[in-house]
Amino acid sequence: MQTHEILLKIKEIAKSKNFNLNLDEKTINQPLRELKIDSLDMFSIVVSLENEFGISFDDEKLMNLKNLADLVLEVKNLLAKKGV
């Protein structure tokens, strides 16, 4: 799965949860706090991604996510382990 596909899914999740986020290829490297994504928002996004893709994030890795690029990379890694 490509970066833009995962980012699109994150955008869909954010929109469905009424998060007011401006997510695109330009903002993917901005710190989460600059995007106004707090820990509860991130938890909600992560749970939705886990359900959508049938993956499970490691809690320690989640604690180290600094931006959406980190999240997308982790999704890609988990999907690769799953053979997707």
Swiss-Prot record:
S-S bridge residues: none
Pathway: Lipid metabolism; fatty acid biosynthesis
Record note on modification: 4'-phosphopantetheine is transferred from CoA to a specific serine of the apo-ACP-like protein.
UniProt record, GO biological process: lipid A biosynthetic process
O-(pantetheine 4'-phosphoryl)serine sites (modified residues): 39
One Pfam family cited in the UniProt record for this chain: PP-binding
GO cellular component, one term: membrane
GO molecular function: acyl binding; acyl carrier activity
Domain Carrier: 4-79
Keywords: Fatty acid biosynthesis, Fatty acid metabolism, Lipid biosynthesis, Lipid metabolism, Phosphopantetheine, Phosphoprotein
Keyword 4Fe-4S: no
Function: Carrier of the growing fatty acid chain in fatty acid biosynthesis.
Name of the protein in its database record: Acyl carrier protein homolog
Species this protein is from: Mycoplasma genitalium (strain ATCC 33530 / DSM 19775 / NCTC 10195 / G37) (Mycoplasmoides genitalium)
